[in-house]
Amino acid sequence: MFARAFPLLRPLIGVIDAEQAHDLSVRALEMLPLPACGPDDPRLAVEAFGLKFPNPVGMAAGFDKDARVPDAVLRLGFGFVEVGGVTRQPQPGNPRPRVFRLPQDEAVINRYGLNSSGMEAVRQRLAKRRRAGIVGINLGANKESVDRIGDYVALLRSLGPHAEFVTLNISSPNTPGLRDLQGRAFLEELLDRTLDARAKANLATRVLLKIAPDLDDLQLDDIVAVALRRPIDGMIVSNTTTARPESLKDKAQAKEAGGLSGRPIFRPSTVKLAKTWLRVEGRFPLIGVGGIASGADALAKIEAGANLVQLYTALIYQGPALLQEIKDTLEAAAPPEGLPAIVGRAARDWASSAC
């Protein structure tokens, strides 16, 4: 129903403010009585992080920031959903306007600044869930925090019991200084403190790390080396980029500050994914995100090293029908032994290609 209505609503969505359009989409999912999708083909099933996913396609963080509609998103047919980013204390984020469409590029620039209703509000919503389905939570530090690592620890303790996985988001370009946590010393302390908190709380929640696409090879080497020496469960590659490719057509909007997402970051994020996969060598799973706008894109991410994929920006332009197109493509491409058999088979080619 929601997918069928999108073509009718698309002209309206395209002319109103981008953030208002996003808010309307969330409200529609809150209000509409969506029927659950039918079961996925068994060939789409994936096991990762010790969890069984009905299909490998997830809704990326950024859509359901305050965990208002995780079950509605799952009913659309996603294999999992990641809510957030969530901060320890409520914060308004950056001043509006802070979201900008680049329709000629099928891209978006955002500088939300981790606007969040806060940890306690999200905890209360998730505690009321009764529906089965895999939900992850993207965790972020408050802009004015004096102990950002302490924020992640508190978020894990509070929200961990209500999620199958949490993501340590240290790669948002819109919180000043947050990407500094990708440096080796900060990252070691972050992982040590959060993983120690998980162990002491006896939580089964998986802990993932989300990195930026703008890392150079030496920075990536450091991050992977630190991660592999600790019981981290996986990585998400990658967040939005601060780069502005010369190929962008919406030149005026491209001048806006913030993180670029959508089709233009598909290649650089997939190259980064492949390079990460070659360094990790299968020791933990990877989620590939960035620029997926078709079934072929999702398949390419898997062949570059992703066990699971996520998308969001392309849905703004193509609507929820894109999800079924992606699943149909993956189902057709899956060998008899399933999608895990093709993970990483093109990683070396991607890693050696130019961004």
Each predicted region: which residue ranges?
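An N-cap/entry alpha-helix motif that binds or orients negatively charged groups
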Residues: 3-46, 110-112
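Glycine/Thr-rich beta-alpha phosphate-binding loop at enzyme active sites
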Residues: 26, 30-32, 37-39, 173-186, ...
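Short beta-strand/loop segments at the ligand-binding rim of alpha/beta enzyme cores
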Residues: 52-58, 131-139, 200-215, 277-288
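Catalytic cores of alpha/beta
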Residues: 66-73, 153-154, 215-229, 278-282, ...
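Glycine-rich phosphate-binding active-site loops on the catalytic face of alpha/beta enzymes
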Residues: 77-91, 170-172, 234-244, 291-292, ...
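A gly/proline- and charged-residue-enriched helix-loop-helix capping module
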Residues: 84-131
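C-terminal helical cap(s) of enzyme catalytic domains, especially alpha/beta-barrels
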Residues: 90-106, 244-258, 314-341
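Active-site glycine- and acidic-residue-rich loops that bind
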Residues: 141-153, 180, 186, 209-229
